[in-house]
Amino acid sequence: GDGGAIFTDDDHTADPIRSLCVHGKGPGGKYDNVRVGMNSRLDAMQAAVLLPKLKALGDYEIDARQQVVERYGRAFAGKLTTPFVAEGCVSAWAQYALLAADTAQRDKIVAHLKEAGIPNMIYYPTPQHALPVFWDEPHYGETFRNADDYCARTFSLPMHPYLEQAEQQQIIDAVLEAL
């Protein structure tokens, strides 16, 4: 299944996040729902399984992912729009998303990767504002230029801490061949 974690040292940020994870519960207790939330808590068994993973994440995995990011970034600089992380921030790099020049270039790269047997993903084929959940909202049907553009051009490459250098090079070569 899916899971996640949010780390912050800011109580102003942490409090609403905790609330969202418990059905939007407010300070008044169980039935004091102050926002729309969901049940996003882990049970004890899931937490026990994930605890060693947190240690690996801190000890090795983020650094290993960062090395892949740096290698991808050097290979694609000036050819595709590469992701960045703002100064003072750290990314766990769950995905490595690139932006092609246009949809045609993105589709050509994605097809070439598929043909080469290299997994890739278009995580956001439909902009969030165009999803059915928002069809009844007042803004539905409006154009959100940046979101529309991003969804038309983005795709993601394999990203994990155990991606061997030879695999990274195969991915890089396949993307560059498609350009």
Language-model segment annotations:
Residues 1-6:
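Glycine-rich phosphate-binding loop of ATP-grasp-fold ATP-dependent ligases
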Residues 9-179:
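PLP-dependent aminotransferase class I/II
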